[in-house]
Amino acid sequence: MWPRDFSERLESWAQLRQQCQTLDSEPALIKINTWWFQAPWTAYHLHWDDQQDWPDPWQLLSDNQYCPVARGLGIMYTISMLDREDLQDCRMIEYQSDNLVLVSQEKYILNWDPDQVVNISLGRSKPRRQVSQEQIKQKIR
């Protein structure tokens, strides 16, 4: 169940990061993906055209509105704050009508399915837009 108020969301998010610190990469990514899919969904909150104005992780949790872009951003913030050597190459892409988080040289795809992290080829199509983990880390500082 998604935490109701901001302080509970902060505590739950901190616990998530702490738990994922010691898990192998795939179980950690599944746990992160599952946690963010519990967030209350809204059709539109953030847009790629407004990337410069995207909230930092604390504002994202405070806003408590999660469209697919916002949920992907939350996943990216979570992975980035783990600062794990094996999870240093994630990026969020706009691919067709989806906003996906790709990790470990696209081995894992998050923000696609609530119950699993998928491992499929996206083919040769180029993403329309993307944001790297390094760009996301700039919002955390």
Where do the PLM segments sit?
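A structural boundary/capping signal
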Residues: 1-141
